[in-house]
């Protein structure tokens, strides 16, 4: 999963991520997730921040750095151990000087394959992707990667990390914590109603095609794309999907596994909660 960086300990990147992720914390229940902010944009981070975040949260919770729930992140670093043995994916390791993280890039389209041609071992790249934790391993599901032509971009990325960390310091997180918690508490009582209301279009759309039913893949994706589902940071439990879409769980599990393998959905806090990939 993670390993020590190939850079020397006394290099310019030593110290690991510039800022320690002491405020990083896990959310272990839906009540505590309300205290964390979900940042929808790309969060500039270092591998060490991700490593410390994963070590503190373990497998019981999501990944949170300084009160920010990590969804999409951006990193810069050196490409190592590129593996193109599979037709549909390319795997490689990113070393940013603070640590290493495994990465995977799907190459289902011509554009994806062309993008990865310029990414070779020893190349500095900037990449963006989703953090995914499954069975004790964390990897980055990459949706964008490009070589760095100007090394100033590496320096700028670390300045971004420092700036973002400073903006979301402990004092600022406490100031907005009460407001965020009160807003979530206000709408908590109506969550079930909203979920039921938004479910109707999905269920009724089963009869939109010529055969009278949509295929299971589309039904599951449509359900996970609903605002009520995307707003839930912990993802949707597979039992809920089975119940709401009236699909036998044993049949649903195979479809979900296929969608995850195709990179259309990803697991969140454990192997039973899922969210769709926002492209």
Curated annotation (Swiss-Prot):
Keyword Flavoprotein assigned: no
Chief place where the protein resides: nucleus
UniProt region (Disordered), positions on chain: 1-33
Gene disruption: observed consequences: Affected cell division in meristems but normal final cell sizes. Earlier flowering and smaller plant size. Enhanced sensitivity to methyl methanesulfonate (MMS), a genotoxic agent that damages DNA bases. Enhanced expression of some transposons. When associated with ROS1 disruption, restored silencing of some genes associated with increased histone H3 acetylation and histone H3 'Lys-4' methylation (H3K4me2), but decreased histone H3 'Lys-9' methylation (H3K9me2) in their promoter.
Keyword terms: DNA damage, DNA recombination, DNA repair, DNA replication, DNA-binding, Nucleus, Phosphoprotein
GO CC, alphabetical: nucleus
Primary role: Component of the replication protein A complex (RPA) required for DNA recombination, repair and replication. The activity of RPA is mediated by single-stranded DNA binding and protein interactions. Required fo cell division in meristems. Involved in the maintenance of transcriptional epigenetic gene silencing (TGS) at specific loci (including some transposons) by regulating histone H3 acetylation, 'Lys-4' and 'Lys-9' methylation.
Record's subunit section: Heterotrimer of RPA1, RPA2 and RPA3 (canonical replication protein A complex). Interacts with ROS1. Binds to ASE1/At3g02920, PDX2, At5g62350, RPA1A/At2g06510, ARF1/At1g10630, At4g18590 and At3g52630.
Protein name: Replication protein A 32 kDa subunit A
Organism: Arabidopsis thaliana
Record gene name: RPA2A
């Amino acid at each position: 999963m993670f390993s020590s960086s190939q850079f020397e300990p006394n290099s310019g990147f030593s110290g690991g991520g510039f800022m320690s992720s002491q405020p990083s914390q896990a959310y272990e229940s839906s009540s505590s997730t309300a205290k964390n902010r979900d940042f929808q944009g790309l969060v500039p981070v270092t591998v060490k921040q991700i490593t410390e975040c994963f070590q503190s949260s373990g497998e019981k919770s999501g990944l949170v750095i300084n009160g920010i729930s990590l969804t999409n992140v951006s990193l810069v670093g050196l490409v190592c151990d590129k593996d193109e043995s599979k037709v549909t994916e390319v795997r490689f390791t990113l070393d940013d000087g603070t640590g290493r993280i495994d990465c995977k890039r799907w190459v289902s389209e011509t554009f994806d394959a062309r993008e990865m041609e310029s990414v070779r071992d020893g190349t500095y790249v900037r990449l963006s992707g989703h953090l995914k934790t499954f069975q004790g391993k964390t990897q980055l599901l990459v949706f964008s990667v490009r070589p760095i032509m100007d090394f100033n971009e590496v320096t700028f990325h670390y300045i971004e990390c420092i700036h973002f960390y400073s903006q979301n310091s402990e004092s600022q997180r406490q100031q907005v914590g009460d407001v965020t918690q009160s807003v979530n508490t206000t709408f908590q009582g109506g969550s079930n109603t909203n979920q039921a209301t938004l479910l109707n279009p999905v269920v009724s759309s089963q009869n939109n095609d010529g055969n009278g039913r949509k295929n299971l893949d589309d039904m599951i994706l449509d359900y996970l794309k609903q605002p009520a589902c995307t707003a839930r940071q912990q993802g949707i439990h597979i039992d809920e999907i089975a119940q709401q879409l009236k699909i036998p769980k044993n049949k649903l599990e195979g479809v979900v596994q296929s969608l995850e393998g195709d990179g259309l959905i990803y697991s969140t806090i454990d192997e039973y909660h899922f969210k769709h990939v926002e492209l």
